[in-house]
A protein has these predicted regions:
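Core domains of carbohydrate- and sulfate-ester-processing enzymes
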Residues: 1-66, 177-200
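Active-site-proximal helices and loops of the catalytic beta/alpha 8
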Residues: 2-17, 87-206
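Residue-level detector of functional hotspots within protein domains
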Residues: 37, 84-87
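A generic secondary-structure signal marking the coil-to-beta-strand transition
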Residues: 47, 206-207
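Short glycine/proline- and acidic residue-enriched helix-loop micro-motifs
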Residues: 68-72
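Alpha-helical scaffold elements lining the catalytic groove of polysaccharide deacetylases
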Residues: 76-83
Protein backbone atom coordinates (compact mmCIF):
# COMPACT_ATOMS: atom_id res chain seq x y z
CA UNK A 1 0.00 0.00 0.00
CA UNK A 2 0.93 3.66 -0.12
CA UNK A 3 2.21 3.63 3.49
CA UNK A 4 3.86 0.19 3.49
CA UNK A 5 7.33 1.75 3.65
CA UNK A 6 6.63 2.39 7.35
CA UNK A 7 6.86 -1.37 7.93
CA UNK A 8 10.59 -1.20 7.22
CA UNK A 9 11.38 1.65 9.62
CA UNK A 10 12.27 1.08 13.25
CA UNK A 11 10.70 4.12 14.87
CA UNK A 12 11.79 3.04 18.36
CA UNK A 13 15.54 2.87 17.60
CA UNK A 14 16.59 5.65 19.99
CA UNK A 15 20.30 5.51 19.19
CA UNK A 16 19.65 5.45 15.46
CA UNK A 17 17.26 8.40 15.46
CA UNK A 18 19.62 10.48 17.59
CA UNK A 19 21.93 10.52 14.55
CA UNK A 20 19.19 12.43 12.69
CA UNK A 21 18.52 15.98 13.94
CA UNK A 22 19.17 15.50 17.65
CA UNK A 23 16.94 16.39 20.60
CA UNK A 24 18.12 19.99 20.75
CA UNK A 25 16.69 20.60 17.28
CA UNK A 26 13.29 18.93 16.96
CA UNK A 27 10.38 17.36 18.78
CA UNK A 28 8.70 14.30 17.28
CA UNK A 29 7.05 11.10 18.50
CA UNK A 30 9.82 8.74 17.38
CA UNK A 31 12.99 7.52 19.08
CA UNK A 32 13.85 9.38 22.28
CA UNK A 33 12.81 12.83 21.07
CA UNK A 34 10.57 15.14 23.08
CA UNK A 35 6.95 14.64 22.13
CA UNK A 36 5.15 17.32 20.10
CA UNK A 37 2.69 19.56 21.90
CA UNK A 38 -0.93 20.40 21.13
CA UNK A 39 -0.68 24.11 20.36
CA UNK A 40 0.14 25.79 17.06
CA UNK A 41 3.78 26.41 18.00
CA UNK A 42 4.77 22.94 19.25
CA UNK A 43 2.48 20.54 17.38
CA UNK A 44 3.61 18.05 14.75
CA UNK A 45 2.03 19.45 11.60
CA UNK A 46 1.12 16.77 9.03
CA UNK A 47 3.31 14.26 10.93
CA UNK A 48 6.42 16.38 10.34
CA UNK A 49 8.94 17.03 13.14
CA UNK A 50 8.60 20.39 14.84
CA UNK A 51 11.74 22.50 14.82
CA UNK A 52 12.47 24.03 18.23
CA UNK A 53 12.58 27.61 17.00
CA UNK A 54 11.55 28.81 20.47
CA UNK A 55 14.57 27.22 22.16
CA UNK A 56 17.20 29.40 23.84
CA UNK A 57 19.57 26.44 24.20
CA UNK A 58 22.78 26.43 22.16
CA UNK A 59 22.34 23.50 19.80
CA UNK A 60 25.35 23.02 17.57
CA UNK A 61 24.70 21.71 14.06
CA UNK A 62 22.07 19.00 13.49
CA UNK A 63 23.65 15.59 14.11
CA UNK A 64 23.18 14.40 10.53
CA UNK A 65 25.82 16.86 9.36
CA UNK A 66 28.46 14.64 10.98
CA UNK A 67 27.74 12.15 8.17
CA UNK A 68 28.27 14.78 5.47
CA UNK A 69 31.99 15.57 5.23
CA UNK A 70 31.44 17.79 2.19
CA UNK A 71 28.87 20.04 3.88
CA UNK A 72 29.34 23.80 3.86
CA UNK A 73 27.46 24.10 7.16
CA UNK A 74 29.69 25.25 9.99
CA UNK A 75 29.03 25.28 13.72
CA UNK A 76 28.62 28.83 15.03
CA UNK A 77 29.31 29.44 18.74
CA UNK A 78 26.24 30.41 20.75
CA UNK A 79 23.71 29.67 18.00
CA UNK A 80 20.28 28.17 18.71
CA UNK A 81 18.16 26.31 16.12
CA UNK A 82 16.41 29.58 15.22
CA UNK A 83 19.73 31.35 14.78
CA UNK A 84 20.98 28.67 12.40
CA UNK A 85 17.79 28.60 10.35
CA UNK A 86 17.64 32.36 9.89
CA UNK A 87 21.36 32.45 9.13
CA UNK A 88 21.05 29.76 6.43
CA UNK A 89 17.98 31.33 4.84
CA UNK A 90 19.48 34.81 4.77
CA UNK A 91 22.70 33.37 3.33
CA UNK A 92 20.72 32.32 0.23
CA UNK A 93 19.71 35.97 -0.10
CA UNK A 94 23.31 37.13 0.35
CA UNK A 95 24.64 34.60 -2.19
CA UNK A 96 21.95 34.69 -4.88
CA UNK A 97 20.08 37.97 -4.50
CA UNK A 98 16.73 36.38 -3.62
CA UNK A 99 14.50 39.39 -2.99
CA UNK A 100 11.56 37.88 -1.13
CA UNK A 101 10.12 34.87 0.71
CA UNK A 102 6.62 33.44 0.65
CA UNK A 103 6.11 31.80 4.05
CA UNK A 104 3.77 28.83 4.45
CA UNK A 105 1.83 28.08 7.67
CA UNK A 106 3.27 31.14 9.41
CA UNK A 107 1.23 30.60 12.57
CA UNK A 108 3.35 27.59 13.51
CA UNK A 109 6.46 29.71 14.19
CA UNK A 110 6.93 32.44 16.80
CA UNK A 111 6.43 36.03 15.63
CA UNK A 112 9.88 36.99 16.92
CA UNK A 113 11.43 34.37 14.65
CA UNK A 114 9.80 35.90 11.58
CA UNK A 115 11.07 39.32 12.59
CA UNK A 116 14.57 37.93 13.02
CA UNK A 117 14.42 36.39 9.55
CA UNK A 118 13.16 39.61 7.98
CA UNK A 119 15.86 41.69 9.64
CA UNK A 120 18.67 39.39 8.54
CA UNK A 121 17.31 38.89 5.03
CA UNK A 122 16.90 42.64 4.55
CA UNK A 123 20.53 43.23 5.51
CA UNK A 124 21.65 40.36 3.28
CA UNK A 125 19.81 41.70 0.22
CA UNK A 126 21.27 45.16 0.76
CA UNK A 127 24.75 43.58 0.81
CA UNK A 128 24.05 41.62 -2.37
CA UNK A 129 22.74 44.67 -4.23
CA UNK A 130 25.75 46.71 -3.19
CA UNK A 131 28.07 43.97 -4.44
CA UNK A 132 26.07 43.36 -7.64
CA UNK A 133 24.76 46.73 -8.87
CA UNK A 134 24.58 45.49 -12.46
CA UNK A 135 22.31 42.58 -11.48
CA UNK A 136 19.96 44.34 -9.05
CA UNK A 137 16.52 44.95 -10.55
CA UNK A 138 15.66 47.83 -8.23
CA UNK A 139 16.50 49.46 -4.91
CA UNK A 140 13.55 47.92 -3.05
CA UNK A 141 14.22 46.18 0.29
CA UNK A 142 13.59 42.50 0.99
CA UNK A 143 9.89 41.58 0.79
CA UNK A 144 8.04 38.92 2.75
CA UNK A 145 4.51 37.57 2.43
CA UNK A 146 2.93 34.79 4.43
CA UNK A 147 0.07 32.34 4.72
CA UNK A 148 -1.92 32.03 7.94
CA UNK A 149 -5.11 30.05 7.39
CA UNK A 150 -8.22 32.21 7.50
CA UNK A 151 -6.40 35.55 7.39
CA UNK A 152 -8.43 38.25 5.65
CA UNK A 153 -8.09 41.98 5.02
CA UNK A 154 -6.74 43.09 8.38
CA UNK A 155 -3.47 44.49 9.66
CA UNK A 156 -2.60 41.73 12.12
CA UNK A 157 0.52 41.22 14.25
CA UNK A 158 2.24 39.58 11.28
CA UNK A 159 2.69 43.03 9.78
CA UNK A 160 4.46 44.15 12.93
CA UNK A 161 6.83 41.20 12.80
CA UNK A 162 8.38 41.38 9.36
CA UNK A 163 5.60 40.64 6.89
CA UNK A 164 4.82 43.11 4.11
CA UNK A 165 1.63 41.30 3.07
CA UNK A 166 -0.48 38.32 4.10
CA UNK A 167 -2.54 36.07 1.87
CA UNK A 168 -6.19 37.12 1.78
CA UNK A 169 -8.29 33.96 2.15
CA UNK A 170 -11.58 35.85 1.98
CA UNK A 171 -11.25 36.91 -1.64
CA UNK A 172 -11.59 33.43 -3.14
CA UNK A 173 -15.19 33.03 -1.95
CA UNK A 174 -16.00 36.66 -2.71
CA UNK A 175 -14.74 36.29 -6.27
CA UNK A 176 -16.73 33.09 -6.74
CA UNK A 177 -19.92 34.96 -5.85
CA UNK A 178 -18.96 37.71 -8.27
CA UNK A 179 -18.66 35.14 -11.04
CA UNK A 180 -22.44 34.67 -10.89
CA UNK A 181 -23.16 38.39 -10.69
CA UNK A 182 -20.48 41.06 -11.04
CA UNK A 183 -22.49 43.43 -8.84
CA UNK A 184 -21.58 41.18 -5.91
CA UNK A 185 -17.96 42.34 -6.07
CA UNK A 186 -18.68 46.05 -5.64
CA UNK A 187 -18.94 45.93 -1.85
CA UNK A 188 -15.83 43.74 -1.58
CA UNK A 189 -13.71 46.12 -3.62
CA UNK A 190 -15.03 49.13 -1.72
CA UNK A 191 -14.23 47.53 1.63
CA UNK A 192 -10.74 46.64 0.43
CA UNK A 193 -10.18 50.18 -0.84
CA UNK A 194 -11.29 51.58 2.51
CA UNK A 195 -9.11 49.24 4.60
CA UNK A 196 -5.95 49.01 2.50
CA UNK A 197 -4.60 52.45 3.23
CA UNK A 198 -1.40 51.60 5.09
CA UNK A 199 -0.90 47.89 4.40
CA UNK A 200 -1.41 45.31 1.66
CA UNK A 201 -2.72 41.78 1.18
CA UNK A 202 -2.09 39.13 -1.45
CA UNK A 203 -5.47 38.14 -2.87
CA UNK A 204 -5.90 35.06 -5.03
CA UNK A 205 -8.63 33.34 -7.04
CA UNK A 206 -7.59 29.70 -6.71
CA UNK A 207 -4.79 27.56 -5.34
Amino acid sequence: TWHSFNDYINFSDKAGWEKWWGKKWIRTDIGDYDNPGYDDLTMSLAFLPDLKTESKEVSGLPNFYSHKPDTAAKAIPGYTPRDYLTHWLSQWVRDYGIDGFRVDTAKHVEMDAWQQLKTQATAALAEWKKANPDKALDAAPFWMTGEAWGHGVMQSDYYRHGFDAMINFDYQDQAAKAATCMANIDLTWQQMADKLQSFNVLSYLSS
